[in-house]
């Protein structure tokens, strides 16, 4: 069958307004004014994540995220929550491989309040021994609930990095080791804040029913007097590509059935031209009943109970930096040998590499991806977080509008070429077996 020709996908690109400015202390600000509903999302992204943790302090980025909710210069321990929720808003934070973020979604009348709250903890966070001890216990309990006492806990995002990577920054447990967490000190936390939570290491992103000029004025008022600090140079975390297959077995006493994760390293996400074909490939293989692996393994062979594919350890391909993996995750019955699953994956990748896409397959895939993306950025929170990560990692919040066009530019030949690089010889395979290790 000849390769499918590139055809035009009839999808539109959004045209959200994006305005920007930078304060003298280095804080970058991006604003999307949208008067369609009286709400606002305020997000602050700090350029520090799990990869930046020092050796002996695994999980520290996540621990510090918790500390940022324990009070600040003008606010007591629970007052950040009280002010946001008392105004009908919601808030949260999360730690990722390459960044940590915090956000509020509020009625637009409370925009200045949200900015004040974020500025107050950027200026000074309440790092005390009591707060540190309390949050170490909270994080340890999270690990017990989400990893240690849950079937497939941490699989594969915590389990495969030590096999896929060799450097500590890329391979360590970003959720945290109990011994490392318990040995954390107030001095560690204060040093972490001083080093990574500087204004020049952050992006403030605002989307909603606001006037951009007013947001900039409030930002100057509340953030402008935070002293500038030296911003750490982000090191290169890249490491040599695997030259042979890496394989290991993980045992899970709580898992009811086996699973396997297969990972490959992909090109640097900074170059979207070479990276996006892999993002599209993951969708071709695993998104929906008509996708290659779902159709083959779930419907035809019935060799699996679920199949997933994504880029980045946490499943969002657009907030990943180099190095990052292409991951396939398959859950299957004990009656299906893991080598049967792996052979099927290899066969489907080889078929795609040799025969290419079928007519219309790329169009359908891009249309689904674009529709899903447009739904995500339809909300003010989706827009604020998308602008923030694009500005932080690519210096271009305007990719908010440009991404659908970049997806449309991906060709069938590029997807075919990407499939050809995912060979068994360079795969990292982590098999999960139910039960305790013998």
Predicted regions and their residues:
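Active/ligand-binding-proximal structured segments within catalytic/core domains
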Residues: 26, 34-84, 272-285, 294-297
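C-terminal regions of mature proteins
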Residues: 2-11, 203-205, 331, 352, ...
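A structural supersecondary motif
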Residues: 261-263, 286-331
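N- or domain-start disorder-to-order transition segments that initiate the globular core
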Residues: 5-38
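Short acidic/His-enriched helical or mixed secondary-structure segments at domain edges of catalytic enzymes
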Residues: 141-159, 238-257, 299-310, 355-401, ...
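An aromatic/glycine/proline-enriched structural segment found at the starts
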Residues: 2-6, 166, 174, 199, ...
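Buried hydrophobic packing residues in well-ordered domains
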Residues: 26, 44, 62, 84, ...
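Acidic/histidine-enriched segments that form metal/cofactor-coordinating
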Residues: 46, 72-73, 77-192, 347, ...
